């Protein structure tokens, strides 16, 4: 039976373009996972959008003399274009400034407040000494009072995992201007996390399939659980849905609270855009559906503790759709099944920093290099389980010595020879035991690679796919069909037929990782239709008349299936071209020079 799989992807913040470190953590792994499950025939809903509220966007707007909405509009388009060009197959990539998102966020706030899970507390708010604006917790750094780590943030210490408030930090400083923040008394609304402590602990304790760092970090976080502020003193954000705040512009819902709700609001928007307003329920109120969340390690607790607490408190909640059948009335919203957290990517041994020029933005990268080359590197050498470093030398080496030399070489030598000598899939003679064994080994890769992908072990899955491609290369080198054809055309045809069958199966195995080249290979092999695309943009008009663009795709029309090759004898091939480009080693010096130029 096909499964319902929700792929919930962290929302990139719309205060600037995204660099390759961002997509290494949230974008590429999620897309690989979603593509695999679609090929398996599962019902996938991959969702995200740009996170468009909060102080950082207002700071950019002030600097440029424009409005926060204008900044959000600009970077929503830039980020959306980048994700499209990288081939991230969202069912919907939307934004948090839509009327739909406001309505869903306010309904959840109101419901939690009415049930007593949102409380009011007097607290000390952090403000910038230079601008007077609220400083988000993550824009305040200082020394952790628990472990002494000197880059602890105002919400938590990434070194020891302690939950913090800005006032807890020793020598706190603003990341905006380096000055100590000014703390002023203010009233805020708080999510009463301790009310869910027992439920959360029991639930997380059962998630033995989570990555150990995610589970352990979450359990440690529960030890010091305390109410979490969900409002801030600012003008840019979702309005607080209580009567006394209807006409107030000085206090809004905190950006982190509305951002995680985006997973639900985006699902609801997708359903309405699809003409089936209740379709979201088959993912969110279906006990058999499984939810997978993808993000960087700095966002773990938002997805393992805070968002689950909100879902538990909301329960069956209100009614975001009509539900005419009454099937889902009283059915609670689904909790995460797995939270797939990536570590951090550095660049040339240093943290990414736009101000210091230590950065390569996605659009800049893709203007000079192929998307599949980046996707390959970020998977095979990315920060899946530990912090890793991107260097231009290693990127060029991986591209040339692995992607081009193994998979690219196999495809090129096979298709070029077959196209030249036969023009179509040749009729094979009797298969030898060696032939049969190779086909069986490659077909078995569908299970081994599939099992690894299903458990979010992307690096191991891609390594196994590359190993299988190398085995087919070894087979060709040993069988030498380019020599055999001179004396035994039938045997040569058989060898090339076996290679084509293996290449066709490997095409499917590589599709989640390398969708662009897999689609081209699909066409070179004489097939029609899409196995990996296309993506598209669509304009959506809301009830209030506003129009926004979403990234989407009609993935139901994909012809690819996670099955062994059924390549028909006699199918005409199309003239092949190399799948990948070999890079000149001078690229390394050129890119390092660009980085140096940005820094200066």
From Swiss-Prot:
Entry cofactors: Zn(2+)
SUPFAM superfamilies found in the cross-reference section: Anticodon-binding domain of a subclass of class I aminoacyl-tRNA synthetases (SSF47323), Methionyl-tRNA synthetase (MetRS), Zn-domain (SSF57770), Nucleotidylyl transferase (SSF52374)
Residues the entry annotates as binding Zn(2+): 144, 147, 157, 160
Enzymatic class: ligase
Binding locations of ATP: 354
Molecular function as annotated in GO: ATP binding; metal ion binding; methionine-tRNA ligase activity
Record InterPro entries: Anticodon_Met, Met-tRNA_ligase_1, Met-tRNA_synth, Methionyl/Leucyl_tRNA_Synth, MetRS_core, MetRS_Zn, Rossmann-like_a/b/a_fold, tRNAsynth_Ia_anticodon-bd
Cofactor mode of binding and number, as noted: Binds 1 zinc ion per subunit.
Compartments it resides in: Cytoplasm
Catalytic activity: tRNA(Met) + L-methionine + ATP = L-methionyl-tRNA(Met) + AMP + diphosphate
Chain location of the short sequence motif 'KMSKS' region per the record: 351-355
Family membership noted in the UniProt record: Belongs to the class-I aminoacyl-tRNA synthetase family. MetG type 1 subfamily.
Known partners and oligomeric status: Monomer.
Protein name: Methionine--tRNA ligase
């Amino acid at each position: 039976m096909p499964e319902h799989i929700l792929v919930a992807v962290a929302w990139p913040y719309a205060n600037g373009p995204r660099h390759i470190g961002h997509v290494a953590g949230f974008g590429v792994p999620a897309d690989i996972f979603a593509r695999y499950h679609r090929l398996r025939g599962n019902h996938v809903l991959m969702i995200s959008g740009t996170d468009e509220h909060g102080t950082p966007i207002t700071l950019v707007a002030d600097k440029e003399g424009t409005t926060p909405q204008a900044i959000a509009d600009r970077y929503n388009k830039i980020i959306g274009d980048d994700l499209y060009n990288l081939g991230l197959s969202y069912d919907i990539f939307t934004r948090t400034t839509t009327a739909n998102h406001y309505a869903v966020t306010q309904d959840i706030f109101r419901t939690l407040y009415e049930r007593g899970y949102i409380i009011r507390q007097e607290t000390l708010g952090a403000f910038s000494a230079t601008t007077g604006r609220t400083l988000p917790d993550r824009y305040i750094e200082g020394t952790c009072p628990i472990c002494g780590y000197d880059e602890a943030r105002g919400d938590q210490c990434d070194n020891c995992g302690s939950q913090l408030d800005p006032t807890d930090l020793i020598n706190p400083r603003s990341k905006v201007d380096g000055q100590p923040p000014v703390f002023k008394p203010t009233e805020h609304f708080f999510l009463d996390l301790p009310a869910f402590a027992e439920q959360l602990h029991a639930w997380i304790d059962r998630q033995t399939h989570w990555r150990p760092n995610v589970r352990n970090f979450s359990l440690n976080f529960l030890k010091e659980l305390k109410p979490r502020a969900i409002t801030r003193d600012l003008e840019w954000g979702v309005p607080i849905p209580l009567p006394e705040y209807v006409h107030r512009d000085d206090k809004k819902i905190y950006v982190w609270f509305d951002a995680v709700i985006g997973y639900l609001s985006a699902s609801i928007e997708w359903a309405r855009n699809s003409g089936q307003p209740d379709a979201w329920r088959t993912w969110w109120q279906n006990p058999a559906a499984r939810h997978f969340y993808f993000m960087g390690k700095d966002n773990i607790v938002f997805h393992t503790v805070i968002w689950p607490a909100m879902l538990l408190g909301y329960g069956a909640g209100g009614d975001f759709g009509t539900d005419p059948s009454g099937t889902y009335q009283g059915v609670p919203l689904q909790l995460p099944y797995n939270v797939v957290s990536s570590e951090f990517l550095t660049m040339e041994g240093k943290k990414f920093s736009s101000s210091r020029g230590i950065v390569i933005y996605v659009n800049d990268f893709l203007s000079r290099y192929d998307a599949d080359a980046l996707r390959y590197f970020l998977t095979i050498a990315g920060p899946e389980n530990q912090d890793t470093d991107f260097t231009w030398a290693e990127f060029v080496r991986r591209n040339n010595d692995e992607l081009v030399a193994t998979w690219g070489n196999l495809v090129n030598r096979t298709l070029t020879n077959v196209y030249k000598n036969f023009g179509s899939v040749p009729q094979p003679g009797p298969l030898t035991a060696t032939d049969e064994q190779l086909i069986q080994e490659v077909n078995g890769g569908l299970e081994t690679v599939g099992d690894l992908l299903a458990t979010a072990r992307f690096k191991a899955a891609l390594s196994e796919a590359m190993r299988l491609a190398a085995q087919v290369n070894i087979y060709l080198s040993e069988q030498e069909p380019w020599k055999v054809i001179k004396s035994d055309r039938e045997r040569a045809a058989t060898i090339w037929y076996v290679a084509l069958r293996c290449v066709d199966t490997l095409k499917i195995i590589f599709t989640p990782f390398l969708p662009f080249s897999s689609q081209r290979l699909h066409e070179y092999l004489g097939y029609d239709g899409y196995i990996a695309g296309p993506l598209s943009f669509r304009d959506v008009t809301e009830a209030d008349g506003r129009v926004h663009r979403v990234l989407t795709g009609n993935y139901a029309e994909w012809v690819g299936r996670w099955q062994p090759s059924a390549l028909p004898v006699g199918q005409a091939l199309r003239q092949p071209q190399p799948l990948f480009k070999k890079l000149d080693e001078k690229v390394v010096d050129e890119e390092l020079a660009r980085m140096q130029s940005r820094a200066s």
